[in-house]
Design a protein with these regions (language model features):
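Extended polysaccharide-engagement surfaces of secreted carbohydrate-active enzymes
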Residues: 1-189
Length: 189
């Protein structure tokens, strides 16, 4: 990954249990971008991407491509929300470090379903911490690329966060190797 004084970019390439994916995360002062592409699976089980799981707190508002809960907005296509009481045991969660301590809580979960054996599935989600429902609805993300070669977004200040999975070019910037970059008008991080 890479970082400047107010933005960060991280990348994760998954190859686990028959599921492969390229995932990139872009952080700035207003939003967190989650991009996933090249999602493939040979597993007989359904594949999903979890965006957030937390205790439910109050109302949930939804639109065609947005969800808002507890001061956090989510923008993206095919977002799936589930709520309900879940039961667990902190003793199991901690790996046996603590004594058994059963608990129940109403949870809010949001994610994307990719189905069984997806081929080249992808997703684009933006998380908006501190946003109102109206701000969430009206937010216009600037996602430049989300493909096997490059994942890139334009941040609110005009800087560009980019993950190159291969050599490539973005505007006047060119890299001969895979890399993670933040591009501004006068600096490269």
């Amino acid at each position: 990954g890479t970082v400047n004084s107010h933005q960060a970019v991280a990348v994760y390439t998954q190859k686990l249990d028959g599921v492969s994916a390229k995932k990139a995360y872009f952080f700035d002062e207003k939003a967190v971008y989650l991009l996933g592409c090249s999602i493939n699976s040979t597993s007989p089980y359904s594949v999903a991407t979890t965006v957030n799981v937390c205790r439910r707190n109050g109302l949930i508002e939804k639109g065609d491509s947005w969800v808002w809960h507890d001061g956090i907005g989510y923008k993206g296509e095919s977002l799936r929300v589930s709520t309900g009481i879940r039961t667990g045991d902190w003793g199991v969660v901690s790996g046996g470090i603590t004594s058994p301590a059963p608990f129940s809580a109403e949870l809010f979960a949001i994610g994307i379903e990719h189905g069984i054996r997806p081929e080249n599935a992808s997703y684009k989600v933006v998380i908006l911490p501190g946003a109102t429902p109206e701000q969430t609805k009206n937010f216009q993300p600037k996602i430049l690329f989300n493909n096997n070669d490059i994942q890139a977004v334009k941040f609110s200040d005009g800087n560009i966060g980019a993950v190159f999975h291969t050599s490539g070019r973005l505007g006047n910037f060119e890299t001969k190797k895979p890399g993670v970059f933040i591009l501004s008008s006068d600096e490269i991080f």
